[in-house]
Swiss-Prot record:
Species of origin: Aquifex aeolicus (strain VF5)
Subunit composition and interactions: Homodimer.
Function, as annotated: Catalyzes the conversion of dethiobiotin (DTB) to biotin by the insertion of a sulfur atom into dethiobiotin via a radical-based mechanism.
Encoding gene (name): bioB
Cofactor: how and how many bound: Binds 1 [4Fe-4S] cluster. The cluster is coordinated with 3 cysteines and an exchangeable S-adenosyl-L-methionine.
Reactions catalysed, as given in the entry: (4R,5S)-dethiobiotin + (sulfur carrier)-SH + 2 reduced [2Fe-2S]-[ferredoxin] + 2 S-adenosyl-L-methionine = (sulfur carrier)-H + biotin + 2 5'-deoxyadenosine + 2 L-methionine + 2 oxidized [2Fe-2S]-[ferredoxin]
Pathway: Cofactor biosynthesis; biotin biosynthesis; biotin from 7,8-diaminononanoate: step 2/2
Protein name: Biotin synthase
Residue intervals of the Radical SAM core domain: 52-282
Record-stated family: Belongs to the radical SAM superfamily. Biotin synthase family.
One BP term from GO: biotin biosynthetic process
SUPFAM superfamilies xref list: Radical SAM enzymes (SSF102114)
Length: 332
């Protein structure tokens, strides 16, 4: 081993022992020369294997249950009312459409299904309809775990969703506390942070991640990763910006392939016990290196995203076959 490899191995040992990495140590991972990426991926894969010995990959699917007309001004998002983007706008879909979405998820082979709503926070009426849909999915006996992403939900709404059978709530920090003001002005990073704490307080599993390629620095990426370590979230979706025409970020810099692999590895080193999910932008940003990314992660989103199409599901099944990995099938 040379000097860099020895240093990376020392950080690997810290992760294996669940010792927190410092900000400087996490930055070191992001700043190594590209020639060390294969070694870095190897170590990240070993960390994953240590905490997740089963060679499994989970498929998760979503439904865009309420689309557009959002009151918030997130600069990356097609659904904000502030931007003219080519999307469909509609209110919360009926219960049967949410159930049909779960059926489609099962057909794709998804183990998780997330009901996603645009807007700062779901109304009481919307929460009620979601709980009806969740109960119906359970009554149908569909072999899929149900998650919800509906903004800054209060404790009462979270408890209702939990009672209905929801296992996990998604609410993304999106980026670091420091960079957040550059992408959103209609609410604060603290609003999102406190929502995650409420989710944990009521005993629901937490899913919270971010988007890379919005102009944030490596320090911002590390700060977000270390915040998730502090919060001990269960699942971290990793998204790479898909620039959308009409949004302020339609010409954002994006992320290069080697850079993306380093980001994924850094999240594995800093959050070794968390499920890492490859989500939006994985097709465009990982390209021929999808397999390397999957070695470090636990899950991937299939069947498309909120306003954009996803990868051909046949390619994801072939990827699992090539990696000799099993598709996770486990209903909580």
């Amino acid at each position: 081993m040379d000097k860099v490899e020895r240093r990376l191995y020392e950080l690997y040992e810290k992760a294996i022992n669940y010792e927190p990495l410092s900000k400087e140590e996490a930055l070191y991972i992001l700043e190594v020369d590209d020639i060390y990426v294969p070694f870095l991926v190897h170590l990240a894969q070993k960390i994953k294997k240590h905490y997740f010995p089963e060679n499994e990959v989970e498929f998760c699917s979503i439904i865009n249950a309420k689309s557009g007309a959002c009151s918030e001004d997130c600069k990356f998002c097609a659904q904000s009312k502030y931007y003219k983007t080519p999307i469909n706008v509609y209110n919360l879909v009926p219960v049967d459409e949410m159930v049909e979405g779960a059926i489609r998820g099962v057909e794709f082979g998804a183990n998780r299904y997330c009901i996603v709503l645009s807007g700062k926070s779901a109304t009481k009426e919307e929460v009620e309809r979601i709980t009806e849909a969740v109960k119906e999915i359970k009554n149908e006996g569909l072999p899929i775990n149900v998650c919800v992403s509906a903004g800054t939900l209060d404790e009462e709404s979270l408890k209702k969703l939990k009672e209905a059978g929801v296992k996990r709530i998604n609410h993304n920090l999106e980026t670091s506390r420091n960079f957040f003001k550059n992408i959103v002005t209609t609410h604060t990073w603290e609003d999102r942070y406190e929502t995650i704490k409420r989710i944990k307080k009521v005993g629901l599993s937490t899913c919270s991640g971010g988007i890379f390629g919005m102009g944030e620095s490596n320090e911002d990426r590390v700060d977000m990763a270390l915040t998730y370590r502090e919060l001990e979230v269960d699942s971290i979706p990793l998204n790479f910006l898909m620039p959308i025409e009409g949004t302020p970020m339609e010409n954002a810099p994006g992320v290069e392939v080697m850079e993306a692999l380093k980001i994924i590895a850094m999240f594995r080193f800093t959050n070794p016990k968390a499920e890492l999910r490859l989500c939006g932008g994985r097709e465009q940003n990982l390209r021929d290196f999808h397999g390397m990314a999957t070695l470090m992660t636990n899950a991937m989103m299939v069947g498309g995203y909120l306003t954009r199409a996803g990868r051909d599901i046949k390619k994801d099944y072939q990827l699992l076959k090539d990696l000799k990995a099993k598709r996770k099938v486990s209903v909580e």
